[in-house]
Amino acid sequence: MEWTDDAIVLSARPHGETAALAVLLTRGHGRHAGLVHGGQSGRMRPVLEPGNRVAARWAARLVEQLGTLALELERATAAGLLEDPLRLAALSSACALVDAALPEREPHPALFDATLALFDALQTEVWAEIYVRWEIGLLEEAGFGLDFGSCAATGITDNDQLAYVSPRTGRAVSLSAGEPYRDRLLALPPFLVGRSAGGAEEVVQGLALTGHFLDRHLFALRHAEVPAARTRFVDRYRKAHTTSGITPAP
């Protein structure tokens, strides 16, 4: 058995004395692991940095075997973010979430393309807003899509009136319908329904929103915790923008 595919490195760890066990997100074969011979060498360690884009060739005698991976670096994504720890933390968070959330060998081509788009966006000024949208897309790919199209209580579709999200169903709730229960609802950042361009306060709201569903509706069902890389990223983002004088909403 053998295939070649475009791929993103999600994680890599030592295996034996010289090899590495790598996990990739591939366009056509989903999340896929394999053994990289010489993966601990000075030549291969930079290739196996999470977030890097690679050309991958996987081979095994039988399809159910772990198999081996031969990788060629196409883009050193992580290296381009070394001077910006916050954006690098976002990259690490995205890789860790995909690695933990997706079943093995189940194709998710739309998520693959969205992840490449996110990594491109990390070079722009709106990267944090796009990151929040990417997490919403990840939830949808995993079967936990959020619905901001109309109010769950009244059916209203006016984006100017949608202000909350039900923590149980993931559906939007209008300002008037949700106001009596606002302490039990999650804030819906205006940028997610086209009412603003975003900003640090709304990004923090968005991360709280997606974090709730990642924790309660995705990882909890698997008796697992949200990856530590995601927690570190959110903590760093909140700290960075609180320190700079922008106090995020609760």
Swiss-Prot record:
One of its GO terms (biological process) is double-strand break repair. This is DNA repair protein RecO. Belongs to the RecO family. GO terms for cellular component: bacterial nucleoid. It comes from Rhodospirillum centenum (strain ATCC 51521 / SW). The keyword Lipid metabolism does not apply. The keyword DNA damage applies. Keywords: DNA damage, DNA recombination, DNA repair. Disulfide bonds: none annotated. Involved in DNA repair and RecF pathway recombination. InterPro entries: ARFGAP/RecO (IPR037278), DNA_rep/recomb_RecO_N (IPR022572), NA-bd_OB-fold (IPR012340), RecO (IPR003717), RecO_C (IPR042242).
